[in-house]
Amino acid sequence: MRSVVTGVGAYLPSKVVTNDDLAKFVDTSDEWIVERTGIRQRHQAADDQPVSDLAFEAAKEALAAAGKTAADVDLIIVATTTGDLTFPATATIVQRKLGAPVGVAFDVQAVCSGFVYAMSVADGFVARGHSKCALVIGAEAMTRLMDWSDRGTCVLFGDGAGAIVLEPGEGEGTTDDRGMLGFALRADGTKQDLLYVDGGPSTTGTVGKLRMLGNQVFKHAVVNISEAIHAAAGKAGVAVADVDWFIPHQANQRILQGVAHRCGIDEEKVISTVAIHANTSAASIPLAFAHGIKDGRIKKGDLLLLEAMGGGLTWGACVVRL
């Protein structure tokens, strides 16, 4: 039994913030941001728009694409760092908003790696017969964590949500099967100080602001993600060169290019949305996934490679045939 992606959805808040907009109140410029990150704009959620609203919209689109309704959903996993409340889980709030029946619903927090981690967990439920229709959602309002005086971080992030529907599918046990083929998940807590938020309910009692040592993160990202990519491909029984599309976490263009180059992935195979979405943390992979489907590049039967790295540090990769 494989867990098969049968629907993909995305949602972006209507407000677009350009680099020129940021340059009005922080010491930066469009040229400076583009040269270092490849980012040209990002979306920002409205003040009265919680993350569950973003997740809800992406989930509706994914369900429609899969030909399913909320009544079919028996598992919801939301990957987020910026949930509505300390508790309950944002997944339960999404469950209520969708009108889904009583089932399993919880959050996964691995920051930018969250969606890959959540996919792995959902795969375990579906492939073992514990779920017949799973929603996996990456949703973030990262702009809520920004220190708007820190030009090294505030220019990097945006808000949004993406979702996939996973359903069980029979296969022949080969790499031609549709579905999840291989995962590699990693974490190294000794690197916590490279990327974190300086707040929390049991420490400061505040939400906190995002802090990052960008150059150190870049160094670890390229090396560690590349290792995870080869590990996931090995578990899937495929070569990296066989991949049709590479859907990386949209951290910045330099990391995307660095990882692709190190792994020998042709630039034409890279789905990049960082210029228009910026870094949306756990939402970035499903947003890019949906973008590639909507523009006609990604098609049923294609072999996809997904990867991410986030605070913790956490990182991981997944090989899936659509």
Swiss-Prot record:
BP terms from Gene Ontology: fatty acid biosynthetic process
Top-level EC class: transferase
UniProtKB keywords: Acyltransferase, Cytoplasm, Fatty acid biosynthesis, Fatty acid metabolism, Lipid biosynthesis, Lipid metabolism, Multifunctional enzyme, Transferase
What pathway, per the record? Lipid metabolism; fatty acid biosynthesis
Q: Give the start-end ranges of region ACP-binding.
A: 250-254
Q: Record's Gene Ontology CC terms?
A: cytoplasm
Compartment(s): Cytoplasm
Active-site residues, record numbering mapped to chain: 112, 249, 279
Q: What is this enzyme's EC?
A: 2.3.1.180
As its record notes, the protein acts as a catalyst of: malonyl-[ACP] + acetyl-CoA + H(+) = 3-oxobutanoyl-[ACP] + CO2 + CoA
Molecular functions (GO terms): 3-oxoacyl-[acyl-carrier-protein] synthase activity; beta-ketoacyl-acyl-carrier-protein synthase III activity
Subunit composition and interactions: Homodimer.
**Functional summary from the UniProt entry:** Catalyzes the condensation reaction of fatty acid synthesis by the addition to an acyl acceptor of two carbons from malonyl-ACP. Catalyzes the first condensation reaction which initiates fatty acid synthesis and may therefore play a role in governing the total rate of fatty acid production. Possesses both acetoacetyl-ACP synthase and acetyl transacylase activities. Its substrate specificity determines the biosynthesis of branched-chain and/or straight-chain of fatty acids.
Similarity annotation: Belongs to the thiolase-like superfamily. FabH family.
Domain remark in the UniProt entry: The last Arg residue of the ACP-binding site is essential for the weak association between ACP/AcpP and FabH.
Name the chain's protein: Beta-ketoacyl-[acyl-carrier-protein] synthase III
Ranked from the top, the taxonomy reads: Bacteria, Pseudomonadati, Pseudomonadota, Alphaproteobacteria, Caulobacterales
